[in-house]
Amino acid sequence: MTPVSDAPATPSSEISAAGQSVFKLFSRPMLGQSFDGIRISIASPEKIRSWSFGEVKKPETINYRTFKPERDGLFCAKIFGPVKDYECLCGKYKRLKHRGVVCEKCGVEVIQSKVRRERMGHIELAAPVAHIWFLKSLPSRIGLLLDMTLKDLERVLYFENFVVLESGMTPMKRGELLTEDRYYQLIEEFGDEFRAGIGAEAIREMLVDLKIPEEINQLRDELRDTSSEARRKKIVKRLHTLEAFQDSKNSPEWMILEVIPVIPPELRPLVPLDGGRFATSDLNDLYRRVINRNNRLKRLFELKAPDIIIRNEKRMLQESVDALFDNGRRGRVITGTNKRPLKSLSEMLKGKQGRFRLNLLGKRVDYSGRSVIVVGPELKLHECGLPKKMALELFKPFIYNRLEERGLATTIKAAKRMVEKEKGEVWDILEEVIREHPVMLNRAPTLHRLGIQAFEPKLVEGKAIQLHPLVCTAFNADFDGDQMAVHVPLSIEAQIEARVLMMSTNNILSPANGKPIIVPTQDIILGLYYMTSERANVAGEGMIFSNTMEVKQAFDAGVANLHASIQCRFRGKRVHTTVGRMLLADMLPERIDFQAINKLITKKEVTKLIDHTYRMCGTKDTVIFTDRLMAMGFAFACRAGISFGKDDMVIPEAKRKLVDAAQEKVKEIEKQYTDGLITEGEKYNKVVDIWSHCTERVADEMMGTISTDTVLNKDGEMVEQPSFNSIFMMANSGARGSAAQMRQLAGMRGLMAKPSGEIMETPITANFREGLTVLQYFISTHGARKGLADTALKTANSGYLTRRLVDVAQDCIVREEDCGTSIGITVAALVEGNDVVETLGDRLLGRTPVSDIKDPITDELLVKAGTIMDEDIVEKIENSNVDSVLIRSPLTCETTRGVCVTCYGRDLARGTRVTVGEAVGVIAAQSIGEPGTQLTMRTFHIGGTASRQAEQSHQETTHGGVLKFHDLITVQDRAGRYVVLSRNSEVSLHEAVEHEGQVEAGRERERYRIPYGARISSAPGSVVEKGTTFAEWDPFAMPIITEVEGIVKFGDLVDGVSLRENMDDTTGLISKEVTEWKGQSSKKGDMRPRITLKDVNSNETLMMPNGSECRYYLPVGAVIVVNEGDHVHGGDIIAKVLRQSTKNRDITGGLPRVVELFEARKPKEHSFIAENEGMVTYGKDLKGKRRLVVTPDSGEPMEYLLPKGKQLAVNEGDWVRKGEPLMEGSPVPQDILKVLGLEELCRFMVNEIQEVYRLQGVRINDKHIEVIVRQMLQKVQITDPGDTMFVSGEQVEKDDYLLENVKTDKRGGRVATCTPLLLGITKASLSTPSFISAASFQETTRVLTEAAISGRVDTLNGLKENVIVGRLIPAGTGNILSQLKKMGSLTKGEKSTQGGEQHVAKVASSSEVTEG
C-alpha cells in the first residue's frame, strides 16, 4: 500500500549512502507527511527490492549461546538494523556520537534500534512462484486473465501437466494442457516445432505475452454479439479483470513472484525463555521453510540435478510460499511442533485477532482504570465518585506538573517520590487538579453512544466508583457487581469536547427516539407514585393553606396526612390537590404548570413531565429538576415502607367460575369434533382461543379486584379509591413488574408452549400463589430454561447485527445544509386493525415537508416547505384535516456520500436542527442495534407463557357514520346475507353529513380490509352506530365459496393419490383432504384437483359471471365439505383451507426477522407479487410448479411459476393490481423495489422493522431505518450502457453512474440506463468504495486482492478508514479539519497534522537537535 501524496519517495540506495538523511528520516515521525488517499497495488519485483535493506540468505535466526542475530539470517543486524540503540553488533561503535556510521567490521549501521520495526529484507527466489491470493481467491484472477480454469492452472503450477506456449506448425493450441507422457511423445514427433512449459515459469511467460488492449476489444465485440446469459456473465467478469489491469498500470506477470519481501524482525519476534528454549512467531518457521527450500533448489541447479528432482523441489518451494502467505488455503495445513496450524501473513490481518480489528480499530489506552460501581444517590447529575487511589494514579502527570510549578519538587523524579509516599500536599494538589477536569465513564458493552459519558469527579474513600442513579438507564447498569472503566481526557481540546458533548447533563434525550433517557426508575417512581396518591378520610382532609410552606409545616407536625385532599394557594391560584403533590410543587420550574404534577404520577407521566420541562425550560432547569425529583422519590419510597407479602396477591373470586365456564365450552367443542362437525385443526384453534380469552378475563377480574379499595369517607359513605396494595402500586406506577406477571402471581398462568413452539391445549389454571402441581411445574420449566438459553445465543447475534449496521452506515455523515431535492416520501398515521399505533404527529415530529402544507378544507397554510416541524406545528397538523404529508427523507436525499440537514431534520439527542458533520449513520446503526440485545434478552420475562392474541373474527365500526364499499364483489347465500368473493375489498367509514334531508357520506374516517369469505350484514350507504358489527368471518379457515348454483363434480380427485379420506380415531368420522401427489403421476400426466359445477338440467359446465368456466382448483391440505353430486347454492362453502395453528408470537421472530430484512434475504415462505395489473388465469402446470398468468389490458402477459399446493391469494378470473400478492407469505424486498418503487420499499422496510420492535415496546425513530435503507440502495445495475464506460449488467455506485452520465451527455453521447439495487448490509459493507473499511470488516484477503488488482485509491472519506490510519474522523469536531483540508486552505508548508501541532513540526524541523 502506498500513500498517495506529494512527498517524494526515498530510494534505498540514497538512504544507505547518506547517513544524515537516515537520521532525519528515523529521528522522529515526520508530522508533515500528509496524504489525501492511500493506493494499493500489486508490488513489482523492483518495488520489493527497493523496500529491502538486504537479502536474507540463511534460515538461521539468532545464536543460541550469545543471543546475537546470525549474519544474513532472518534477524541479521546488517539488514534490519542494530539490536541496541546506537550500538553496532561487534561493539566497535557505541553512543550517539557515531550515529549514521556503518561499522566496517560487522556492517551494522549505528542508529536507533526501532528501525528493526520498519526495515524489510527480501528473498531472491531460485524459481518464480505464483502468489496464492491471485491464484486461489475466487474467482481466480490469473485464471480470468489467461482464460483457464483453476484446476488446469493448479495442474501446471504444481508440476502435473505441461502447457503449450507456442504451437508453431503443430495441431496443438496455445494454452492446451499435456500430460508428461504426451509431452515426450510430441517432442519425439515434432522436435522443437512447438514449445511447452511447466510450473510458474510457464504461467509467467503466458502472462507476459498477454496483450491486454487487444483482448479487451475482442471481448467487447463478443459481448455485443452473444445472446447467451451465462456466456455474457463470463465475458463481463473477464472484461472487468482485464480493464482493472489496464487502468491500474499493474503488470499481470507481477502476480508471479520472483522475489518475496521479509517483514521487519520486530513484527515476528523471537524471545528467549529460561531453560534455553525460544518462543517464536510462526512466521519465522514459515520463512525458514521457504529459505531452506530455496537454497536447496539453488544447490540442485549448480549440481545440474535431474529434471524430476528439480521439479519436485520447485513444487515444494511453491507450497512453502503458499503457506507463508495463506496457510491452509491450498493442500494440507502446515503445522508446527505441537500439531497447531502455523499462522500465516493472511491470518495476521484476518478476524477479531487480526491486525485490523485488534490493533488498528481497537487500541488500549493509558490513563484509564476500572472498578466496581456503587450507587451515589447524593451526587449531582454531572458528578461521579472517583476513589482517591484511582484518581492519584490517573492524574499523575498533572500532579507532577503542579508540584514542580509550586516548587514543592525540583525534578520529576522528586515529584514521583512524593506521590509514591502519598504526602499530605499531594492530596491537596489532587483536589485542585481534579476540580472541573471531566473524566469519562464507560460500561461494556457500549451499545450506543450513551455508553460513554463524561462526569466531574468527586474524590471518595474506598475502592468503588460511585454512579448517579439517573444515568443507569443510559449505561444499562445496575449495582449487582457491574464494573465500569474511567478514562481521562488529557489535552485541553479533549476536555472541552468531553464537557460540551459528552457531559451527562448534555445527554438528556435518547438519540434513538428523542425521548428523555434521564428518567427516574424503580424506587424513585414508587416514591413519587406513593406521595401523589390520594386517600379518603385521613388527617387534614379539606384543610385550606395559603402557601406551600404552611403545607410543609402541617405535614411535618403530623396535622395533615401525605395523602390528604386539601386546597392551597399556589402562584396566585387556588388549587385542589393533596399534601404530597404540594411538596412536589416546591421544586417545579417556573414555566411548568402545576397541573402537570397535580395527578397520580406514574412512569409515563414522569417521562412526559421531563420531556415537557426540557422543551419549555432548557437543559439547566431540567437537570436541577430531575435531581430534586430523584431525592424526593428516594425519600418517600423509604418512608412509604412498601413491602411485598403473599396476602398482597389477591385471587379473584370469579376465577373458579370463569375456568369452569371455559372448561364447559371446551367440552362442547370436543363434542362437535367427535360428531365430525369440525376438523382436528379447527378444534385446536378454537380451544386455544377459548383459553386465551379465559386467561384474559381472569386477569381483568384480578386487576379489577386488586386495583381499587372501598373505604369510608369523612361523611360515612362507602367510596372507591385507587388501591394501596403493594403489588398493584409497583406495577401500576411502572416501578417494577407488569400486569402479565401479576396475572401469573394471582390470576392463572395460562397457556404454555411446547418445546416445538406450538401451544398446548391444556393451560395451567393455577397461579404461583396457589402453587403448581408437579405436572404444571414440569411444563413450566421448559419455558423458563429456553429463555435463559436464548439470552446467551442472541446477545452474540445482536452484537453482530450492530457491527454490520455500523459498518454499512459509518460513512453516512451530514454533509451540507440543503440538497435541494423535490422528492420525498409520504407518511400517514399508522393503523393496525382498529388501533392507531402511531399518530401522524408522532411521525412528522422533527421532519421537513417537501412543499407547503395546507388544510384541505379551510386552505389555511399550516407550515411552509423546508421548515423543520416542532411540537407546536405538529399539534396544528393533528388538529387539522390533513391525512398524509410528503416529507423529505434521507432515502431520497441527493447529497453525495451523506445526507443534508433538511432531509434529515431534527437531531433527536438535542431536539434542534442537526448540525453539519454529525455522524448520523453510526447513530442510526446504534439506535437499531442497541435494543436488539434487549429484544433478545426480554424473552424469558414471561417464562414461556403463551400470550397468543385472540384472533379477530369480525369487524366493528370505531365511530358512527356512513359505510361505503370498494372493489366489493358479493353473492347472496341461502340466508340472504352477502358473502364477499373479492380478495382486496375495503370498506370505508365516512362522517354522516345531512344534505337536503338526506344523509350523505362526508370525509373518510377509517378504512377496513374485508377478507374473502366474510359475511356482510350491512348494505352499502347504510348509516351505522359506533360499535356496529358489519362483517364476520372464520379466522381459522379460508373458505372456497361457490358463486353460482349447480351440481358438484370432482376432477382429478383420485382416492389414494390426490385425495385422502381421513378417518378420525376418536370420532370414527371421515373427512376428505387434498394431498400431495408428487411422483405419483397419473396416466393423464399432471393432476390438478378441482371441483367443477355442472348445470342442474343440462349437466354442462356452468360459467362464472366474469366469463370463465366455473372451476375451483384446490390447494394441498384443503378439506372438502361437499360430496360429488351434491346440489349447492351460491355462497355455499365447498371446501376450506385451515390456517396453520398459530405458533407463539415471541420475539424469536424478532431478531432473525430484523436481520432477514436488513440482509435483504428472501423469506423462507416468500410470496410472489403481480408485476402489472391484469386478469388472472391458470396456465399449463410445470412439474412441481403451478403456472399463473396475469394478462393486462394491453401488453405482454406475465407468467409466474408458484410452488404447488401453496395457498393462492387469487382465483381464476380475478383482476389483480400491480404489487398485489398472488400467494400467501411475506413479499421479497427486491420485488417490491422492482415493481412498486423506492417509496413503497421504504414503507415496507420501516413498517416491518418497526413492528418487531413495537412488539417489545421499543421506540425507534423512522429516520434511523431510512438511513440504513439508504445505504443499502447505493448501487445500481446497468441495463443499457449507451456510450459510457460501463458494461451491461455491471453493478456501480449511484454517484459514479450519475457522474459518468453527465460526462457522456456533455460529449453528446448516449447516456446509460439502470435499475436500483437493494443489497443486504453485509454485501453493501463489502462493496463500499473504501477498501480499508471493507477489509477491516470481513473477507479481508478477498477485498485486498480485488483492490490491489484495480489499483484502488482509498480517499479516506469514512470514519473507519481514518481511525485505521490514525487521523481524526471527518465527523463532529474533526469535520472542520477535513473540510479545511479539502478546500486546500492549509498551505503546503503547514499541512494539517490533525491535532494542532503545526508549530511543533516547524520548530522541530528548523532546529538541529544535539544530544550528548
Swiss-Prot record:
<protein>
    <recommendedName>
        <fullName>DNA-directed RNA polymerase subunit beta'</fullName>
        <ecNumber>2.7.7.6</ecNumber>
    </recommendedName>
</protein>
<feature type="binding site">
    <location>
        <position position="88"/>
    </location>
    <ligand>
        <name>Zn(2+) 1</name>
    </ligand>
</feature>
<comment type="subunit">
    <text>The RNAP catalytic core consists of 2 alpha, 1 beta, 1 beta' and 1 omega subunit. When a sigma factor is associated with the core the holoenzyme is formed, which can initiate transcription.</text>
</comment>
<dbReference type="InterPro" id="IPR012754">
    <property type="entry name" value="DNA-dir_RpoC_beta_prime_bact"/>
</dbReference>
<dbReference type="InterPro" id="IPR000722">
    <property type="entry name" value="RNA_pol_asu"/>
</dbReference>
<dbReference type="Pfam" id="PF04997">
    <property type="entry name" value="RNA_pol_Rpb1_1"/>
</dbReference>
<feature type="binding site">
    <location>
        <position position="106"/>
    </location>
    <ligand>
        <name>Zn(2+) 1</name>
    </ligand>
</feature>
<dbReference type="InterPro" id="IPR007066">
    <property type="entry name" value="RNA_pol_Rpb1_3"/>
</dbReference>
<keyword id="KW-0804">Transcription</keyword>
<feature type="region of interest" description="Disordered">
    <location>
        <begin position="1387"/>
        <end position="1412"/>
    </location>
</feature>
<keyword id="KW-0460">Magnesium</keyword>
<dbReference type="GO" id="GO:0003899">
    <property type="term" value="F:DNA-directed RNA polymerase activity"/>
</dbReference>
<dbReference type="GO" id="GO:0003677">
    <property type="term" value="F:DNA binding"/>
</dbReference>
<feature type="binding site">
    <location>
        <position position="480"/>
    </location>
    <ligand>
        <name>Mg(2+)</name>
    </ligand>
</feature>
<feature type="binding site">
    <location>
        <position position="90"/>
    </location>
    <ligand>
        <name>Zn(2+) 1</name>
    </ligand>
</feature>
<feature type="binding site">
    <location>
        <position position="478"/>
    </location>
    <ligand>
        <name>Mg(2+)</name>
    </ligand>
</feature>
<dbReference type="GO" id="GO:0006351">
    <property type="term" value="P:DNA-templated transcription"/>
</dbReference>
<dbReference type="GO" id="GO:0008270">
    <property type="term" value="F:zinc ion binding"/>
</dbReference>
<comment type="function">
    <text>DNA-dependent RNA polymerase catalyzes the transcription of DNA into RNA using the four ribonucleoside triphosphates as substrates.</text>
</comment>
<feature type="binding site">
    <location>
        <position position="482"/>
    </location>
    <ligand>
        <name>Mg(2+)</name>
    </ligand>
</feature>
<feature type="binding site">
    <location>
        <position position="900"/>
    </location>
    <ligand>
        <name>Zn(2+) 2</name>
    </ligand>
</feature>
<keyword id="KW-0548">Nucleotidyltransferase</keyword>
<dbReference type="InterPro" id="IPR006592">
    <property type="entry name" value="RNA_pol_N"/>
</dbReference>
<dbReference type="GO" id="GO:0000287">
    <property type="term" value="F:magnesium ion binding"/>
</dbReference>
<dbReference type="GO" id="GO:0000428">
    <property type="term" value="C:DNA-directed RNA polymerase complex"/>
</dbReference>
<dbReference type="InterPro" id="IPR007080">
    <property type="entry name" value="RNA_pol_Rpb1_1"/>
</dbReference>
<dbReference type="InterPro" id="IPR007083">
    <property type="entry name" value="RNA_pol_Rpb1_4"/>
</dbReference>
<keyword id="KW-0862">Zinc</keyword>
<keyword id="KW-0240">DNA-directed RNA polymerase</keyword>
<feature type="binding site">
    <location>
        <position position="103"/>
    </location>
    <ligand>
        <name>Zn(2+) 1</name>
    </ligand>
</feature>
<dbReference type="Pfam" id="PF04998">
    <property type="entry name" value="RNA_pol_Rpb1_5"/>
</dbReference>
<keyword id="KW-0479">Metal-binding</keyword>
<dbReference type="Pfam" id="PF05000">
    <property type="entry name" value="RNA_pol_Rpb1_4"/>
</dbReference>
<dbReference type="InterPro" id="IPR038120">
    <property type="entry name" value="Rpb1_funnel_sf"/>
</dbReference>
<dbReference type="InterPro" id="IPR044893">
    <property type="entry name" value="RNA_pol_Rpb1_clamp_domain"/>
</dbReference>
<dbReference type="InterPro" id="IPR007081">
    <property type="entry name" value="RNA_pol_Rpb1_5"/>
</dbReference>
<dbReference type="InterPro" id="IPR042102">
    <property type="entry name" value="RNA_pol_Rpb1_3_sf"/>
</dbReference>
<feature type="binding site">
    <location>
        <position position="903"/>
    </location>
    <ligand>
        <name>Zn(2+) 2</name>
    </ligand>
</feature>
<dbReference type="Pfam" id="PF04983">
    <property type="entry name" value="RNA_pol_Rpb1_3"/>
</dbReference>
<keyword id="KW-0808">Transferase</keyword>
<dbReference type="Pfam" id="PF00623">
    <property type="entry name" value="RNA_pol_Rpb1_2"/>
</dbReference>
<feature type="binding site">
    <location>
        <position position="893"/>
    </location>
    <ligand>
        <name>Zn(2+) 2</name>
    </ligand>
</feature>
